């Protein structure tokens, strides 16, 4: 089963009949329109390419416009691809949120919020050094970042200050709380990566 592309609306909570509060993220999943079907013979692998939403005509490039016209669909806000295993799709076909009706858990992929350049304490959860006791300059610095003349360098991958966030993140095995096909909404338990209105990819959980 393939996934779908949606948009993070925000978080809220819903209550069970017993009165238990469940924190949920609301994901709006408009119809995903098939723009291309890739086959083993033509492309070397099987996949389906989809688009969703809409884009102003003035913002669509000529190559993109031709691609959408060939598929017979309205220009969307992007193109995404899902690998397929035996499923049959046709150009212009619409795939809706109700495909998750019988799915218990999903994996959600998005782009995390960008935090800019951050230090080791915020970026890697390093402990801070002494506030006093002889320390007057190095409260939030990393400390030692290497050894001695051997190896005489800082190892690759050393956790240091740098750019935090704005990277692809996947949260696995989030419970599907509700599927509202009429309003095109999917409610999942817990938080998903990204800012409000950012695009997210929802797939059936690989570890479910």
UniProtKB/Swiss-Prot annotation:
Q: Which residues carry this modification: N5-methylglutamine?
A: 149
- UniProt keywords, alphabetically: Methylation, Ribonucleoprotein, Ribosomal protein, RNA-binding, rRNA-binding
| InterPro entries documented for this protein | Ribosomal_uL3, Ribosomal_uL3_bac/org-type, Ribosomal_uL3_CS, Transl_B-barrel_sf
Organism superkingdom:
Bacteria
Q: Does this UniProt record's set of keywords contain Thylakoid?
A: no
As recorded in UniProt, coiled-coil segments are none
Any single biological process term in GO: translation
Q: What post-translational modification does the entry describe?
A: Methylated by PrmB.
GO molecular function, a single term:
structural constituent of ribosome
GO CC annotation: cytosolic large ribosomal subunit
**What residues form the membrane-spanning segments?**
none
Q: Which SUPFAM superfamilies match?
A: Translation proteins
Instruction: Give the function comment from the record.
Output: One of the primary rRNA binding proteins, it binds directly near the 3'-end of the 23S rRNA, where it nucleates assembly of the 50S subunit.
- Give the UniProt family note: Belongs to the universal ribosomal protein uL3 family.
Subunit composition and interactions: Part of the 50S ribosomal subunit. Forms a cluster with proteins L14 and L19.
Name of the protein this chain belongs to: Large ribosomal subunit protein uL3
Q: Which organism is it from?
A: Mannheimia succiniciproducens (strain KCTC 0769BP / MBEL55E)
């Amino acid at each position: 089963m393939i996934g779908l592309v949606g948009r993070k609306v925000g978080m809220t909570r819903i209550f069970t009949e017993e009165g238990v509060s469940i924190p949920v993220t609301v994901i709006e999943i408009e119809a995903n329109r098939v723009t291309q079907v890739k086959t083993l013979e033509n492309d070397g692998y099987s996949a389906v390419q989809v688009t969703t939403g809409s884009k102003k005509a003035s913002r669509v490039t000529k190559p993109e416009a031709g691609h959408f016209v060939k598929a017979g669909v309205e220009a969307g806000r992007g193109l995404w691809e899902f690998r397929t295993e035996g499923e049959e799709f046709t150009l212009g076909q619409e795939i809706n949120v109700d495909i998750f009706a019988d799915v218990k858990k999903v994996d959600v992929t998005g782009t995390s919020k960008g935090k800019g350049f951050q230090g080791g304490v915020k970026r890697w959860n390093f402990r801070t050094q002494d506030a006093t006791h002889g320390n007057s300059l190095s409260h939030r610095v990393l400390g030692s970042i290497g050894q001695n003349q051997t190896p005489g360098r800082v190892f690759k991958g050393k956790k240091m200050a740098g750019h935090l966030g704005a990277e692809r993140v996947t949260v696995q095995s989030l419970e599907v709380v509700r599927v509202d096909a009429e309003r095109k909404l999917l409610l999942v338990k817990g938080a998903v990566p990204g800012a409000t209105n950012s695009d997210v990819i929802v797939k059936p959980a690989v570890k479910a």
